[in-house]
């Protein structure tokens, strides 16, 4: 008994160490990601009568400074933009403070909570003590590698509130249904189930739909097995009510009109279209479905492919008849696949919208792993050991490269902000554009800030809503971004390429010191690091 207890204690310590290490790295990464894009417009009270804060036409800006401002802003937002009242309220709540550190701390905690909820969904057991070290590695590594559009869904303040934080509400609502399937609970408070259903349904469109699908599947199974309890129906009713509040918001129609008439979000031609967006004339044409399949569906499926390995091994090792676990894994797989599939019929397909897919696929992968009898590392063949070491090495390089890219871009954006503050009395302010270090960006892929999300403080159009909001945020004149800057990162000679390798490492070292010990004399350090540019 003592030996068994010691073994369990050792596993618990190892799992806790994995989660804490992952949390520390993710907190560091959170600190590196600056405010950008929608973070500036959402810092102000939403004024729907002037086309809102994200479209051309707004000229007056008043910061959200208290809960009264927030309530006024969200009422206007709900009537004139979209129905994501819970997510956008959280966005504006954390933007009341200028310092992003409060969000960074909370966001890291929410990310770890999301992994714990995924574990409970997959195994039907709550708590760290029920997670083995191998499962902890799958949860942390699998989430980092497979979460779609990681920066936009889990680190960008506005995006994280809409996807990571709303994923908490969705998976928390589904959890009692999962526990019921595993026979862990029978009774559950109806009022709590109804409330969690409303919160889940009123979150985001794809996530709410996925939660409704999974909870509905378990409710139907319970009815067929004569295991139904009234709280399950109350939860579904709450989910449906929440989705109605989300989808029938008066602002949804207004937003579509504004984006078509007064904004540059929707492109005018296919050549101008950004990933996930298409001109109105091409909606529901062959070109739209081809674009969505290539840029959205397949990217999500391929990104999540590593999580299918435990599932494939699970079914390959099976020799007996179909079990309850088989059905549960297939149900999670179906919900995961439904998310990118449904998005094929959406008028917009930003990859971040498929975030809920990774929640349920990771739960399925964890459930499969918990039933596998895998050999220890010492029992593996030399070829398998090499494969494991190679996979770990690639993962470490990917994580480190993403931190280096984010550090370098963070310093570039800090310089933009310092320049704006130092010259805010001028009528026009010109800032250098930001550039991505090519070598580390290649190694990091989309696990770091990349061309799909990077924009610095603003864009190259001084009249763009983002530029106007950033100028109002810092109390400056019009801001222009010099997109024609001949940056050394874009040059092909040997010296420039060497600089593109060494300079980001210096940025990483300085940013690490700044986060750990404080900013210090940042301007002096930045002048030194950029004097060769």
Predicted regions and their residues:
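Membrane-interfacial loop-to-transmembrane alpha-helix junctions, especially the N-terminal start
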Residues: 12, 128-138, 189, 228-235, ...
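Intrinsically disordered, polar/acidic, low-complexity terminal segments
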Residues: 11-86, 91-118, 126-134, 385-533
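Short hydrophobic alpha-helices at membrane interfaces in multi-pass membrane enzymes
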Residues: 179-199, 228-234, 383
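Signature aromatic-anchored transmembrane alpha helix within multi-pass, membrane-resident enzymes
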Residues: 190-193, 240, 329, 372-399
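Transmembrane catalytic cores of multi-pass membrane glycosyltransferases
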Residues: 27-103, 157, 198-336, 344-353
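Transmembrane alpha-helical segments
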Residues: 114-122, 169-181, 212-220, 310-312, ...
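Membrane-interface micro-motifs in multi-pass membrane enzymes
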Residues: 132, 137-181, 204, 301-303, ...
């Amino acid at each position: 008994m003592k030996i068994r207890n010691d073994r369990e204690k050792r596993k618990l310590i190892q799992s806790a160490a994995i989660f804490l290490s992952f949390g520390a790295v993710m907190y560091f990464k959170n600190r590196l990601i600056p405010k950008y894009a929608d973070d500036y417009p959402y810092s102000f009270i939403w004024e729907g009568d002037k086309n809102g804060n994200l479209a051309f036409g707004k000229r007056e800006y008043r910061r959200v400074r208290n809960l009264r401002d927030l309530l006024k802003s969200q009422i206007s937002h709900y009537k004139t933009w979209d129905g994501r009242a819970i997510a956008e309220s959280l966005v504006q709540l954390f933007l009341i403070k200028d310092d992003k550190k409060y969000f960074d701390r909370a966001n890291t905690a929410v990310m770890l909570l999301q992994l714990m909820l995924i574990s409970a969904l997959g195994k039907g057991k709550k708590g760290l003590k029920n997670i083995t070290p191998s499962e902890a590695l799958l949860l942390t590594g699998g989430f980092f590698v497979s979460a779609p559009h990681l920066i936009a869904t889990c680190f960008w303040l506005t995006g994280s509130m809409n996807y990571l934080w709303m994923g908490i509400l969705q998976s928390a609502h589904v959890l009692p249904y999962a526990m019921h399937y595993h026979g862990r609970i029978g009774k559950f408070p109806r009022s709590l189930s109804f409330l969690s259903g409303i919160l889940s349904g009123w979150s985001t469109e794809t996530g709410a739909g996925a939660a409704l699908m999974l909870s509905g599947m378990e409710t139907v199974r319970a009815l067929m097995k004569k295991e139904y309890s009234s709280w399950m129906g109350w939860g579904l009713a709450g989910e449906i009510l929440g989705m109605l509040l989300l989808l029938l918001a008066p602002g949804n129609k207004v937003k579509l009109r504004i984006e078509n008439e007064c904004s540059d979000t929707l492109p005018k031609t296919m050549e101008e279209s950004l990933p996930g967006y298409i001109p109105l004339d091409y909606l529901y044409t062959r070109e739209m479905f081809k674009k969505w399949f290539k840029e959205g569906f397949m990217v999500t499926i391929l990104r999540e492919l590593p999580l299918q390995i435990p599932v494939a091994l699970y079914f390959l090792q099976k020799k007996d008849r179909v079990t309850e676990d088989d059905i549960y894994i297939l149900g999670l797989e179906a919900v995961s696949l439904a998310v990118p599939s449904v998005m094929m019929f959406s008028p917009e397909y930003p990859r971040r919208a498929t975030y809920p897919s990774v929640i349920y696929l990771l739960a399925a992968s964890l459930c499969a792993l918990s039933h596998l009898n895998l050999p220890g590392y010492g029992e593996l063949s030399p070829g398998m050991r090499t494969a494991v070491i190679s996979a770990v090495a690639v993962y470490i390089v990917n994580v480190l490269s993403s931190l280096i890219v984010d550090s370098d871009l963070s310093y570039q954006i800090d310089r933009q902000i310092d320049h704006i503050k130092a010259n805010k009395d001028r009528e026009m302010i010109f800032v250098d554009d930001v550039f991505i270090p090519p070598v580390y960006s290649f190694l990091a892929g989309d696990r770091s800030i990349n061309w799909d999300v990077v924009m610095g403080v603003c864009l190259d159009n001084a009249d763009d809503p983002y530029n106007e909001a950033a100028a109002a945020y810092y109390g400056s004149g019009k801001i222009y971004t010099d997109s024609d800057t001949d940056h050394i990162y874009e040059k092909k000679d040997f010296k420039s390429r060497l600089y593109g390798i060494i300079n980001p490492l210096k940025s990483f070292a300085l940013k690490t010191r700044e986060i750990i010990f404080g900013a210090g004399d940042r301007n002096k350090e930045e002048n030194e690091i950029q004097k060769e540019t």
